[in-house]
Amino acid sequence: LDFNVNYEYSDQGGYPYFYTGKVNEEERKEDTRKDKIGLISYNDESSYYRSLLNASVNIEYQAQNFILSAVTGYQHLKDRMFLDQDFTEKDIFNLEQKQKLNTISEEIVFKSKPGRRWQWATGAFGFYQWLHTSGPVLFKRQGVEEMIEDKANENFPNSPMAPSMKMTINNETLNIGGSFDTPSLSGAIYHQSTFNDLFVKGLSATVGLRLDYEKTSMKYRSISEPIDFDFSISMQRPLLNLSDQHMKAPSTFIGKLSNDYLQLLPKFALQYEWKKGNSVYATVSRGYRSGGYNIQMFSDLAQTEFQRNMMYAVKESEKIDDPQYGAMIDKMIDGMIPEAVDVKAATSYKPEYSWNYEAGAHLTLLESRLWADLAAFYMDTRDQQVAKFSENGFGRITINAGKSRSYGAEAAIRAAITNAL
């Protein structure tokens, strides 16, 4: 019986990122922030606090012909991250993210005694995680202007023949709320058998199979402060001058998503050991990494929803309705309304699957004074999960990148020159 507990606490500053300049050589010449290269130039303090508790109990029973073990684990995490998310001296936006996590796991393994010709192991694994994340994003005045107001005005036609349109946002700050519950449940049963001295002495074969089930879900509640904005449209010929003030555009996302995954993961291996410490081997196995949700995307989704609702507010305004040109204005506005937000498509990423192949050798040479390990591997991955920056350029998200192949070789050599060295 083993019982382990450990606790960690930290409260510190964080995220000392600095500006490295433009990537393109031509753009470097016109870089307006040259004086900030190599400098940390935040205007908001960044910090990180964490409280972490881990506990585990390991129980093992050894019978005459088998070993039974059970491992129970528990983890509690509470943290807070405050981040100047634009990483510059500008007053654009910041993030305060708090997490509270509780995880419990159990694994029971029933296996044979070592040294037997048939070595086997059968087990079951269960895991449940509760995770609540609060991550409101605060857009300050400069962020409201550059990331919402300017983007909205960029969508308006810029032609002498088209009406002149302008949108002005009156909010000094804009708070985009974010509250997320993302629990996950996982369970697995598995068996692996190794047959030693199969057909000839030194040849062993391993066959394993794991049935894995996982359920992930996300309950989201992102309610943002409504945008207060003014809008005007004007033309010289024919004369047209319409405007409305203090219109409102909300952004609200409330809902729940869930996904279930059931996978069979086989494993096959052959090894031939002709002398102790000298062997060749080959393995084939299927790998799996579960999918999940990008809660960081909700600030991007809120910006799109704001633009949609601002355009709808303009379209429904009685002050911007003209008897002669109303149909033309409505048609123009319809062409500038972004597509409706699909929360599931925008925030979900799929599981990653792979087939893994490896062959190699372990060699003991020169009367056990030289050891060499050689290996070659190949991985065929589908729906590979990769990290990328979000569309607004701030924060990272996980996406699926289709398929990829990885291959390579490794070599390691160790030597004992003398008995003491």
Sequence positions of predicted segments:
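Outer-membrane beta-barrel channels and translocator barrels
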Residues: 63-64, 113-117, 198-200, 275-277, ...
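Transmembrane beta-barrel architecture of outer-membrane proteins
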Residues: 50-54, 58, 101-109, 184-190, ...
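Membrane-embedded beta-barrel scaffold of Gram-negative outer-membrane proteins
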Residues: 58, 62-63, 67-83, 279-281, ...
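Transmembrane beta-strands of outer-membrane beta-barrel pores
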Residues: 7-11, 63, 74-78, 126-130, ...
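Outer-membrane beta-barrel domain signature, strongest for Gram-negative TonB-dependent receptors
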Residues: 1-121, 127-133
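Residues on the lipid-exposed face of transmembrane beta-strands in outer-membrane beta-barrel proteins
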Residues: 1, 57-61, 106-112, 189-195, ...
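Solvent-exposed loop segments that connect transmembrane elements
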Residues: 15-40, 86-94, 136-177, 217-258, ...
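Transmembrane beta-strands of outer-membrane beta-barrel proteins
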Residues: 1-3, 68-70, 119-124, 203-209, ...
